[in-house]
Design a protein with these regions (language model features):
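Alpha-helix boundary/capping detector
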Residues: 24-28, 82-83, 136, 140
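Alpha-helix initiation and capping sites
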Residues: 30-31, 46-51, 104
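Short beta-edge/loop segments at beta->alpha junctions of small alpha/beta modules
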Residues: 1-40
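Residues in well-ordered beta-strands of folded domains
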Residues: 17, 73, 92-94
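A short, charged helix-loop
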Residues: 85-95
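Hydrophobic alpha-helical interaction segments
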Residues: 94-172
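Short gly/ser-rich loop at a beta-strand->alpha-helix junction or flexible surface loop bordering the NTP-binding
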Residues: 11-15, 42-80, 85
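Short alpha-helix boundary/capping elements
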Residues: 7, 64, 137-140
Length: 172
């Protein structure tokens, strides 16, 4: 009824918003990225997912490529992977192997990125490793944080953590 009266606008299934009177276009519209972040990544109080894949590799500066499909790992997904449309944006959602929280989200993002970095990077291996090392130093990850998610680390990730020297940057 509120949609019919014009108080609310329907964005997508189960997603409604209060439109603001805009300038040239009349009404305001929701940014698909904001809807994606709220639905699959975090709200005001908690974090329950993270962006991974080419999007995160781009955020780190390892590539200039922009993905057509945003990959997200989230606690709110029950399947091992599916693709959905949020507005005009395609999103690939995957279930998290480790429950994502405010405490471990950046570390889980890094661990996913380590495996994907060589596939997507436009930099040399040395520049890629240096970028990853500076990210670890900037975030000041601890060995305790790493041990809390260690059961989800696969062999390829563990190998690169050691070979690239990233594991030695974790603080005691």
């Amino acid at each position: 009824r509120l949609v019919a009266k014009g108080f609310l606008e329907r964005y997508d299934n189960g997603i409604y918003y209060i439109p603001k009177a805009g300038g040239l276009l009349g009404k305001s519209y929701l940014d698909p990225l904001l809807v994606i972040m709220r639905k699959y990544v975090r709200n005001k109080y908690e974090t329950y997912g993270y962006i991974t894949g080419l999007s995160f590799v781009n955020q780190l500066g390892l590539t200039t490529q922009m993905p057509a499909v945003i990959e997200i790992v989230t606690n709110t997904e029950a399947t091992n992977g599916r693709t959905v449309m949020v507005g005009s944006q395609k999103v690939r959602i995957k279930k998290s192997a480790v429950p994502v929280s405010n405490n471990n989200v950046e570390l889980l993002q890094l661990l996913d990125c380590i495996v994907q970095a060589e596939k997507y990077t436009e930099l040399s291996l040395k520049e890629t490793v240096d970028t990853m090392l500076s990210y670890v130093r900037q975030k000041r990850f601890t060995k305790e944080q790493l041990s809390e998610v260690s059961y989800a680390i696969n062999g390829a990730t563990a190998k690169k953590l050691i070979e690239w020297g990233i594991i030695y940057e974790f603080r005691s």
